[in-house]
Every structure is written in C-alpha cells, then in structure tokens.
A protein has these predicted regions:
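Structured catalytic-domain cores with a bias toward divalent-metal coordination
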Residues: 1-273
Length: 273
C-alpha cells in the first residue's frame, strides 16, 4: 500500500520492483499479494501531499465512511478491501524537508505483534512510538485496531526516489513473504535493525531562521560532539548555530531542505542520553 501522499514517490518504485519479480517467477507465489500503488492518484498527478482542491490529508480520514465525502468513501473502500489480510505494509517517503533512513515505525501497544515482522523488513531502524502520539485516523492505526497487522515504513525524501532504499525494502518484503509461506524461496539475508523507543530519540531543531549547511555526508553512526551542520546567515557572513550530536548513536533523520525557520527539525539522533 502506498501513494497515500502524492509527494511520496519511493513506494512507486517499490511496487514496480515487487510486480517485476512476481511476473518473473509466478511459480513461486503461494498466496495472494494485493498491491495498491496509488491510493491518492490526484495527489500524485499534481505532486501534492494531500488531495487537491480539498486540502485534505488522505492519511487522516481512515477508516472512512461509505456515506461520507469522496475521500471518506474511498478510505472506507480501501479498508473493506484489506480486511481479512494477514499483513499490510504501508509505504511512505518523508516530506520535502527531511531525509529518512529506511525504517519501520510501530506503536508501543502493537509492538508485541508487529516487532517480529518489523525485524524481517531489512530496515536499518525500528522506531517504537508511544500510542498516545499516534492519530487514530491513519490507515495503520485503523487496520491494526480492526485486526490486520500493519507496518509503516518511512524512507528517503519527498518528491524523490532513492533506489537503494527502495531495493532494501523490497528485499525485506520478499523475506517477510518467504517466512509467511507466501513466496516459495529461501529467506533473504537482511539487516538486523536497531530497535528504539520514542524516549531514546533526540530531536535537534533550529534555534533561529537561516540556511542549513550539512557537515555530514550521510546518515549513520556518529559520536558525541560530531559536527552535524551549521545554520548560517548569508548577509552577515556568520554562523548562527553550530549543531553537534549530543550523544553517541546514529542519525536516522537529516535535514534536506536548506531553508530553515526557528523550531524546524534538523536531525533525529538515536542514542543514550
């Protein structure tokens, strides 16, 4: 399942790779795989995150209503279609502002059921959220509470495709399908993800508005005091804020759009306090 947000494109490539492999080896398919590549087609066509003209986030109207407005009617149809499935994977990219390491996100009230699946997904990181912070109008929340185990993956950045991230998740999906008996092939070797809870994540934000210039080439392991980047003031030729890691750990979210305003997210760092 992907395409809920029209500016999240990694899922398009993931669906392409899955269909390509299914078509290449139909004899290996031992179950039913339903693929929803674009549940917000108007958003994808116009490159907008929400549903055009309605200014509405598609991932805020589930489980929908058969007698409701257009978006609610579509959401209800999607839910009805998926009910009874053994598993659903909701694939997202980040927005246009930050880049995300391939990760699986699950609620703490569903982690006992979902964590074994999440570990098979070939993600680098599994982030376990407090259920209090999760909106009950999302697809994943609705399906989990209706009895369909649902994982949420996040990767890359909005309006872009990162093929390496996509291929990693595709390998994870086929690994998961092999373990579930849906795909008749040897399970793939996958990453052993870092498991984090919300309390182990530090949010680094901009103290003032300016231009962010990254000092790290990529996300991954860092040490305490590592120079992550600077927020600069071009007119005065000065550094407004030097941003360093407060802990040993990994950066799994990093600013992509250089223009920042006070309070904007620069990075998320997992590690000890």
């Amino acid at each position: 399942m992907t395409g809920t947000h029209g500016d999240e494109l990694d899922g398009q490539y993931v669906c392409y790779e899955i269909v390509k492999q299914l078509n290449a080896h139909p004899e290996k398919l031992k179950g039913i795989v339903d693929i929803y590549p674009d549940v917000n087609p108007l958003g994808l066509d116009t490159g907008s995150r929400g549903i055009p003209m309605f200014d509405l986030d598609m991932n805020r109207v589930f489980p929908g209503d058969n007698n409701g407005a257009m978006a609610e009617y579509v959401a209800a149809g999607i839910i009805e279609d998926i009910i009874g499935s053994d598993l659903c994977i909701d694939i997202h990219s980040s927005n246009i502002f930050v880049n995300e390491m391939p990760q699986v996100r699950i609620n703490d009230d569903t982690q006992e059921k979902l964590l074994p699946y999440a570990k098979m997904m070939n993600a680098q990181f599994v982030w376990i959220y407090s259920s209090i912070t999760v909106l009950d109008a999302t697809l994943a929340y609705s399906l989990n509470h209706l009895g369909v185990p649902t994982l949420v993956t996040e990767m890359g950045v909005g309006n872009r495709i990162t093929p390496k991230y996509c291929r990693d998740i595709v390998d994870g999906i086929f690994n998961l399908m092999s373990h579930m008996g849906i795909w008749d092939d040897e399970p793939k070797e996958v990453n052993e993800p870092i498991i984090s809870t919300e309390g182990e994540v530090t949010f680094l934000t901009a103290k003032e508005s300016g231009i962010f210039v990254s000092a790290v080439d990529s996300m991954g392991r860092i040490g305490i005091g590592t120079h992550i980047g600077d927020i600069i003031e071009p007119i005065e030729g000065r550094i407004i804020q030097r941003i360093e890691s407060p802990t040993d750990g990994i950066i799994f979210t990093l600013r992509e759009n250089p223009v920042v305003h006070k309070g904007a997210l620069i990075a998320r760092v997992y590690g000890g306090r």
